[in-house]
Amino acid sequence: MKKILEDVMLICVGNSKVKGDSLGPMLGSFFENNNLYDAIVIGTTNNPLSYNKLEQMKNYIDSNKLKKKIIIDSALGNSMSIGKIYISEKSFIVGDGVNKGIKLDADFIIKGVVGTNHTCIEKNKKELQNVDEKILKSIMNKIIEILPILVWKKYIG
């Protein structure tokens, strides 16, 4: 499995101080601490890739043309989508749920829906604070399981 992700940059977006926004950093720490893959990991619980830090890192991420880029982030959606994972192959606007936005291009964007999206930004912030930890762990396990399969199918298989 190590070789599958050796040319990959995992961009694990989020703020480890906000439970619902910590999916990316939690996964980044998992991949880094367990040394499962030879991927470059950006964003961990000890060194989270929050919105403000992403502004500083964007040039580094964009300039690294040799790596396949996979963005992992939490998202808000409708109540029926909580716990689901959405995968796309396009650009991604980080911070969209709280009316901010930094565009990143990636080979894959993996979003785990952790709570309900509201029209009010303050409600969204509160929603992210009150996410059920069981939902986070369930989404994490799904992403850990599917990540090598995604890369394999796209680049090897």
What are these regions (language model features)?
Residues 1-157:
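N-terminal catalytic or cofactor-binding beta/alpha core of small enzyme domains
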